[in-house]
Amino acid sequence: MRAVVQRVKRSKVEVDGKIIGEIGKGLNVLLGISVEDKKEDISYMKDKILNLRIFEDEEGKLNKSLLDVQGELLIISQFTLYGDCRKGRRPSFIKALGGEKARSVYNEFIDQCKDSVHNVQTGEFGADMLVSIENDGPVTIMVDSEKIF
């Protein structure tokens, strides 16, 4: 699994002109799922993201996690995070998991996050979405279950 995690003041996602998910202070997570992902990757990514110390403490240092600040979470599926641009000019997405298998992994990730976070909002899996993000900082972190970065 691969995620782009952005600290936000607010974020929302729309489908067909309707807001389907919206949060205030928290994290916007763009989540990509690989054909190689396993069940333990879901727990690893959830724990890593929810406990990333990317919120400021009283001294202005990045010492607090989403859980510490009781922030909100917006999770959006993003298969293009597995786009491979090494050959040619058109990305290849053969490493991205698709269809119902990907939807199942995405939903399991959401369910695990809901066990810890009071407000979890989501995009619509497989839909064409308009995502509005008001970055805070900006603070943007990439997380990968294969630990390649």
Swiss-Prot record:
Domain of life: Bacteria
Entry keyword Cytoplasm: yes
Function text: An aminoacyl-tRNA editing enzyme that deacylates mischarged D-aminoacyl-tRNAs. Also deacylates mischarged glycyl-tRNA(Ala), protecting cells against glycine mischarging by AlaRS. Acts via tRNA-based rather than protein-based catalysis; rejects L-amino acids rather than detecting D-amino acids in the active site. By recycling D-aminoacyl-tRNA to D-amino acids and free tRNA molecules, this enzyme counteracts the toxicity associated with the formation of D-aminoacyl-tRNA entities in vivo and helps enforce protein L-homochirality.
Gene Ontology terms describing biological process: D-amino acid catabolic process
Name this protein carries in UniProt: D-aminoacyl-tRNA deacylase
Assigned GO CC terms: cytoplasm
Localization: Cytoplasm
GO molecular function: D-tyrosyl-tRNA(Tyr) deacylase activity; Gly-tRNA(Ala) deacylase activity; Ser(Gly)-tRNA(Ala) hydrolase activity; tRNA binding
Membrane-crossing residue ranges in chain numbering: none
Family: Belongs to the DTD family.
The species this protein was found in: Clostridium kluyveri (strain ATCC 8527 / DSM 555 / NBRC 12016 / NCIMB 10680 / K1)
